[in-house]
């Protein structure tokens, strides 16, 4: 779990996301509050509930990107999922409790990685012994083994093929048994594929011929897992999920009930009703054991351009007490997105062309022109936010990208005139840009 201060979290998000200070502050405070709660002692710790967040903002303004970057920062079980994937309990499809089951799998993966790091040295020694057995046989003399061990450590045998037996992970090698309309689903807490895999003896490994270099990673993972207590790992992962789990529910505006619509609404209001106990705090049965959701942080986000936040069920609104409004992007924001972020679009484009030996030289007025065209098209056609920049930029460098292989060693200047020449006629014609930009 991260111990960054709210200021450090915001500055980390600033490296990749332009503007949206309010949203960054809200998620930074929420993340820090997880750590603060851990410092409390006694019954008060159980009483402190997370303050769930609802992020409201137009498409392409950075809601999902904040979630992606937060996942890397959190150092805790984090799941990003779309609310539109679920249907009401009792209908074909995934029910919302699958969110918690997926989060537990993420938590187990994170905890397993930590445990593997702790036993890495022992696992590497065991993997090396297995590779030596495959190379020279278990009955070889100590001198022969030591000779091969030296070559192995000097990477001289990396290309040599060996035959090793690897245990399949989970139900690998077994056909997938799925309930129609519910991919990867569980019947209650039991995963059908896992159950049938065990019943049909799917745990036996098959010998495989692979190179020594390729054998290391799976063997180290397998030997690490032998040294790790699975039951203790699962208990620790569930505890981590219950205390520090974060769920990012995207596209929540798409499950608002539409006015004037009648009939079954199995993936809208029904899903909202099912989310209520999950967000408030309930116990979900998973194949690893029961999981309490009382202290899982939920961050919901939506564009709300067709519906309004007030269209959500009042009970659900009450369970998302912190509202953050993200602002539409301006010309200045677009210029920052093109140049200022750590992996900006201009840096990406220049780096891609350099692989062909072509140097792109974007002038200041070219960047200004790109930003203005994107804003104009967003205003006249459909506002898709920062995603519009990718469309405009691709159109500008389309010709260079196509002929780059023949222009190795060239430096191509891109100025405002070049940008206007490529896109302005389309940007000016609203009907054309509706289909092309």
Swiss-Prot record:
Residues annotated to bind ATP: 18, 60-65, 250, 315, 387
Known InterPro entries for this protein?
Answer: AAA+_ATPase, ATP-dep_Clp_protease_ClpX, ATPase_AAA_core, Clp_ATPase_C, HslU, P-loop_NTPase
Indicate yes or no for the key word Hydrolase.
Answer: no
Q: Do you know which PANTHER family this protein is assigned to?
A: ATP-DEPENDENT CLP PROTEASE ATP-BINDING SUBUNIT CLPX-LIKE, MITOCHONDRIAL-RELATED, ATP-DEPENDENT PROTEASE ATPASE SUBUNIT HSLU
* Job description of the protein: ATPase subunit of a proteasome-like degradation complex; this subunit has chaperone activity. The binding of ATP and its subsequent hydrolysis by HslU are essential for unfolding of protein substrates subsequently hydrolyzed by HslV. HslU recognizes the N-terminal part of its protein substrates and unfolds these before they are guided to HslV for hydrolysis.
Gene Ontology cellular-component terms for this entry are: HslUV protease complex
- Which UniProt keywords are present, listed alphabetically? ATP-binding, Chaperone, Cytoplasm, Nucleotide-binding, Stress response
- UniProt subunit comment: A double ring-shaped homohexamer of HslV is capped on each side by a ring-shaped HslU homohexamer. The assembly of the HslU/HslV complex is dependent on binding of ATP.
One BP term from GO: protein unfolding
Cell compartments where the protein resides = Cytoplasm
The record's similarity note reads: Belongs to the ClpX chaperone family. HslU subfamily.
- Which one Pfam family would you cite for this protein? AAA
Fetch the SUPFAM superfamilies from UniProt: P-loop containing nucleoside triphosphate hydrolases (SSF52540)
The identity of this protein, by name, is ATP-dependent protease ATPase subunit HslU
For this UniProt entry, the molecular function terms from Gene Ontology, in alphabetical order, are: ATP binding; ATP hydrolysis activity; peptidase activity; proteasome-activating activity
